[in-house]
Amino acid sequence: MSIQSSEIIETIKMVADQNFDVRTITIGIDLHDCISADIDELNKNIYQKITTIGKDLVETAKILSAKYGIPIVNQRISVTPIAQIAAATKADSYVSIAQTLDRAAKAIGVSFIGGFSALVQKGMSPSDEVLIRSIPEAMQTTDIVCSSINIGSTRAGINMDAVKLAGETIKRTADITPEGFGCAKIVVFCNAVEDNPFMAGAFHGSGEADAIINVGVSGPGVVKEALENSNATTLTEVAEVVKKTAFKITRVGELIGQEASKMLNIPFGILDLSLAPTPAIGDSVARILETMGLSVCGTHGTTAALALLNDAVKKGGMMASSSVGGLSGAFIPVSEDEGMIAAAESGILTLDKLEAMTAVCSVGLDMIAVPGKTPAHTISGIIADEAAIGMINSKTTAVRIIPVTGKDIGESVEFGGLLGYAPIMPVKEGSCEVFVNRGGRIPAPVQSMKN
């Protein structure tokens, strides 16, 4: 791949004019050596390990940002799923552990901490169930703790008992947190990855090292401007522009990850090259799709345009780093993307269309606000639909949905900061209650038999 002098200038402009940033440096921390049958001892061990390993993360990010002139927006921590770490306590609530995570994260100054999680794709242990039932109060009583539940996989199928409980958990969290904000910190996955640096779904997988650095980059504005300034006419040429731009974005993330690894003396794990939008004008995935030729994101052709974008980003990123991992693609969070917000408000971008888009993009239904009266079984049905797409297509899918108590279609909810605001989107009138209440497990598909 040849590099022209104009491309070097473009790289400089990425930061100055196009909202390019390193979205996060995330340290993953293994907590297995913190296990104790005494929950107070466990909490003490967790606090000590997180504050010891993560104490220099924020300062390191500041030094690297100043050295290279690249904004590093967030510093985060992910930990081993707490349902695994807390099982020996036999406690009936893990809220105190969530509060310990919150205190530890605040003590070292990070933005978020993830890993208040349970992996229940094939069944729930007593500890898994305790954790899931602890989520509403944990979200109510903490500020920066994020939670996730993996309810399915291509190899295991979909655990519908866990899907039902997840829907009830989200509904309960919405009822006890202001405007359902606690739900913005809960993700329900199918095929969750163990090295995700992004919140709210990050956790530190059991196959990872004792500590690891994972980096997430962001550059929707860079891609959009590259397309606007290119001479691309055919979609083949559009894909080539996106691929070359993703290469440049990825090289920056690789540099930051390697440097952070040296400074912190922690191994570099992966670089997640997902295009992660923000509510800022010019930092939108939806606007990239419109630049390709759509009048509005959500119209016919949107899924195809998103597939092109997602694939080109991966191809460009793979050439720039041998450590690509995480989710790596394009995020479509409604409340965090100015173009998605506008498309949803116009009525063109619907929940159904977003579901179709998730079949070809990085994750799933993300930061979607729905009426507060939405029943738990409907939320479970939405989760099951999304999980089915992930299970059949052997990809990660997820749901981060916010039922906003007291609000209905036509209103909106303001989350602030990177989480933005979202119009309340309609859900289907029909009921899936009988289907969800059947429970059991949707068997793994035939494509799970790969050996």
Swiss-Prot record:
Domain of life: Bacteria
Pfam families registered for this protein in UniProt: DUF711
InterPro entries linked to this entry: UPF0210 (IPR007841)
Subunit structure: Homodimer.
HAMAP family in the record: UPF0210 (MF_01221)
NCBIfam families attached to this UniProt entry: PRK05313.1
Protein name listed in UniProt: UPF0210 protein APL_1491
